[in-house]
Amino acid sequence: MLSETNIIELFKAKTPLKDVQVDIGDDAALINLQNNALIACKDLMVLGTHFPEELSAYDIGRRSVLVNLSDVAAMGATPKYLLMGLTLPQELNNKFWMKDFARGVHQICKAYKCRLVGGDVCRGPLSVSVTLLGDPEGRNIITRDGAREDHDLYVTGNIGDARAGLENILESKRVDLRNQCTRSFVSPIARVELAKRLTKHATSMIDISDGLYNEIKILADCSSKGFVIDSNKIPISTALKKKYKHRSVEIAFTGGEDYELLFTLPKGLESWITKLSKKFSVKISKIGYCTSSKSIKLLNYQGEKLEQRTYDHFRK
């Protein structure tokens, strides 16, 4: 069994950053800010609610950072510093599990050039809480309330794969990363660099964590607007269609855990979006447009009503 000090040592940074003056091991981190603005977000991952027991320590470590990176990306900022809280059951408190978890955290931090600067650990049911700080670096901050009438609505990637991936794991009781949908759940992609470019024209933006329909409704409510959505334009993978057949659009609307970007743009920017799509090798689909109606209208949709199908942690 590792002591708290042993665990903390596993997370000490391997590459120093000049703006971090006081690091892990002190009572708090000291960071020199070059700009006045700071983006802050927090996500909590709990075993059985946010991830199944089949995930490895490495994958849990990676995913705990990635879902926070997606929140910072949704505002167009650059991720910089992480604070992590870890509750750990005694049976997992061993050097093998902890080293694997720490390796996952460090791997994503290195890939996205951000830094774990502090945190806490205690015994309890497995959960990971991450606070991520980001720097706008002088770019526009994209919030959820800027959609305007006639603005186009876009989404990145394929929607619904992560839901299918989670069900694959729960059904088979194993993690098969050869499966496209399973990979989408285990290792989502934070669209950080693309989001930075989107700040040039995007008027509102949100990441898709709790289902596409739910996030569309949030943008509508925050902007006091509505949307018309063409269900035929929702980007759905062949793998999702194969698994759910005629229910694939419904699953895309309600599934959650995709961590793709949903955003609005003024009309007439299709060629600009096409260039970004090619540059970042990311599918970007126009799925609808904004209205003044304060309601969501779905075209070409044949599935169940969606209002009561959106994800809510506290809904039974």
Cite the ranges covered by each PLM segment:
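Glycine-/charge-enriched secondary-structure boundary and capping motifs
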Residues: 1-13, 90-115, 123-126, 133, ...
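Glycine-rich anion/phosphate-binding loops
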Residues: 20-22, 53-69, 91-103
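Residue-level signal for inorganic ion chemistry
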Residues: 30, 68, 76, 116, ...
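Glycine-rich anion-binding loops of enzyme active sites
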Residues: 35-38, 45, 78-167, 289
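A short, N-terminal amphipathic alpha-helix
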Residues: 64-75, 109-110
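A short, charged helix-loop
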Residues: 168-189
